[in-house]
Amino acid sequence: MPVKMVAIFGASTVLWILFAVSQAFKIEISPEYKTLAQIGDSMLLTCSTTGCESPSFSWRTQIDSPLNGKVKTEGAKSVLTMDPVSFENEHSYLCTATCNSGKLERGIQVDIYSFPKDPEIQFSGPLEVGKPVMVKCLAPDVYPIDRLEIELFKGDRLMKKQDFVDEMAKKSLETKSLEVIFTPVIEDIEKALVCRAKLYIDQTDSIPKERETVRELQVYTSPKNTEISVHPSTRLHEGAAVTMTCASEGLPAPEIFWSKKLDNGVLQLLSGNATLTLIAMRMEDSGIYVCEGVNLVGRDKTEVELIVQEKPFTVDISPGSQVAAQVGDSVVLTCAAVGCDSPSFSWRTQTDSPLNGEVRDEGATSTLTLSPVGVEDEHSYLCTVTCQRRKLEKTIQVEVYSFPEDPEIEISGPLVHGRPVTVNCTVPNVYPFDHLEIELLKGETTLLNKFLREEIGTKSLETKSLEMTFIPTAEDTGKALVCLAKLHSSQMESEPKQRQSTQTLYVNVAPKEPTIWVSPSPVPEEGSPVNLTCSSDGFPTPKILWSRQLKNGELQPLSQNTTLSFMATKMEDSGIYVCEGINEAGISKKSVELIIQGSSKDIQLTVFPSKSVKEGDTVIISCTCGSVPEIWIILKKKAKTGDMVLKSVNGSYTIRKAQLQDAGVYECESKTEVGSQLRSLTLDVKGKENNKDYFSPELLALYFASSLVIPAIGMIIYFARKANMKGSYSLVEAQKSKV
């Protein structure tokens, strides 16, 4: 009994251990055993375990092909992702999980298919009643093709059914179709065609995947019984209106197109409406009009002829048969049709040159605007008016001219009496310049006339001039210089266009030699007033300019008044003064010398050592004069037999060892431009005493001192006066005695 219990206990222990192990480590796979995946979709295979903290996973196909997917393991779960699913994913996949020494494995079969779109219904052409047409039902991109079945229904009636079991399956996507030919009838309108495709993916599953397309039948009938109605009539007058209506039968309802048959048989499309209305009919509107009914399966047409009868009309053109237009202005040519409601206009030049203007048509009037007018616009213009089948033309001649500005007078320089001058009369921007005449007049006298007719004209604006040289005189002042320009027209105007410019002549006369008045005298005494007055004749009146001539010959301007005044003259005012008369015609000048004289009280006659000397003494007689230019000093000794001029040095005369015969009257004469002055003194020479050998020492010393001091004093006085007084004269020169 105990042995049996032990055996039972041991067996139960082993079973418990096995049960515990089986509970501790399990593997599961999802989806289970088998799954379907559509090509292009995403597929997840999940392998998970229980009873193991850190299992390891591995995936493989049963035939060891590539997985063609991505594996992601997290803890006790591993996922194989196939994105997108392709043919390479059709396998049996095995997931192996290992936990320590234990290993478990699960497998799953992945089958793939492709059935992504609804079938398509295609027709070989439009469904026209009574005409056979082929309809095709297509199932695109299918796999496996051997499990496909296609059915085609018209309404509830099965037209055809087809499967593809006999076709060899391929590892590829295929498009299969079912084709049926049938003849549409009127009763098919609004019926539906149904194309149904079935894919039996799992042979054990009797329910297939199914897709279908439904298309309502659009049945057509070709247009027929096309008819035209015309109101009011097919025969019309110019300016009248007509309405034509067209109708046609067919399915779908035909579109109506109106055309006109041209002379060459070509149809000119006019309208896409059932009703065609023509207003203000013209002659050219006559003809055959065609109505055509058109739909997808056919067309039907009919025609009608309209006859439009003409009526007379005239054309007027303004402003006339000829018009003159200035360059830069605007001119409007107007062409009007009378008796035609809807005329058509065209403009051209007689030489078929380009039109440079703007054409505007409004009703029965057409205008051609030339703005701005240029020389290229000079043409004969033709306006052609078409009224139905009739044409009329009118011509207008446009003459272009340019004469925008008055002439310009240019003179080569100022007008000076007796001096030749060139006058230029310019006429700017003239056209046509070969019709230009230029005349130059002085007062009422024609100086020169020129007609440019002989020059070759060009199609451009040109500037022309007339030039001449004449010598103006003083008598021309106040006269008018006139430049007269005339532009002659060819035929349009009897009188030429005129422009003129006038310039009053003012002839300049150069200043004559000035006249100078000096009051009271050109040699006044120092301190007295002096007025220098100048005048000069000329035109315009000369301006007066007083200047002083410097030692270097240059002129120092002093005044622009006619009178130059000195209130109190000074010695330095002496000099040459120049008066200039100045105007635009020239300069004239004259000079005068002003000499300022010193007063006579400055003359002194002295003797050294005294007027009474002894025989043998040295005597110095001196004559001096201050602040007097141009002075002559003459020392003389009066005698009964005649005056004896003494040879003086700087106004001094020295008697060495005076003798009794040296006694007498000595005279100093000073001469200037205004007169002379005299000074005199008497020298007394006494004879020696008995002791002839006696010579006083004091007298000897005095003699030597005087011989040195007196010349020194004279030199000092000379240089001082020369330095302080401008214009003073050296007494050295005064020794040149004048008798």
From Swiss-Prot:
Matches recorded under Pfam families: C2-set, I-set, ig, Ig_3
Keywords, sorted A to Z: Cell adhesion, Cell membrane, Disulfide bond, Glycoprotein, Host-virus interaction, Immunoglobulin domain, Membrane, Repeat, Secreted, Signal, Transmembrane, Transmembrane helix, Ubl conjugation
TM annotation in the entry: 699-720
Extracellular side: 25-698
InterPro entries the record matches: ICAM_VCAM, ICAM_VCAM_N, Ig-like_dom, Ig-like_dom_sf, Ig-like_fold, Ig_C2-set, Ig_I-set, Ig_sub
N-terminal signal peptide: 1-24
Glycosylation site positions: 273, 424, 531, 561, 650
PTM annotation: Cleaved by the metalloproteinase ADAM17 to generate the soluble form.
Residues annotated as domain Ig-like C2-type: 25-111, 119-212, 223-309, 312-397, 408-506, 514-595, 601-682
GO biological process, alphabetically ordered: amine metabolic process; cardiac neuron differentiation; cell adhesion; cell chemotaxis; cell-cell adhesion mediated by integrin; cell-matrix adhesion; cellular response to amyloid-beta; cellular response to glucose stimulus
Subunit record text: Binds to ECMV-D capsid proteins and acts as a receptor for this virus.
Functional summary from the UniProt entry: Cell adhesion glycoprotein predominantly expressed on the surface of endothelial cells that plays an important role in immune surveillance and inflammation. Acts as a major regulator of leukocyte adhesion to the endothelium through interaction with different types of integrins. During inflammatory responses, binds ligands on the surface of activated endothelial cells to initiate the activation of calcium channels and the plasma membrane-associated small GTPase RAC1 leading to leukocyte transendothelial migration.
PANTHER family: INTERCELLULAR ADHESION MOLECULE, VASCULAR CELL ADHESION PROTEIN 1
Record's protein name: Vascular cell adhesion protein 1
Organism: Rattus norvegicus (Rat)
Gene that specifies this protein: Vcam1
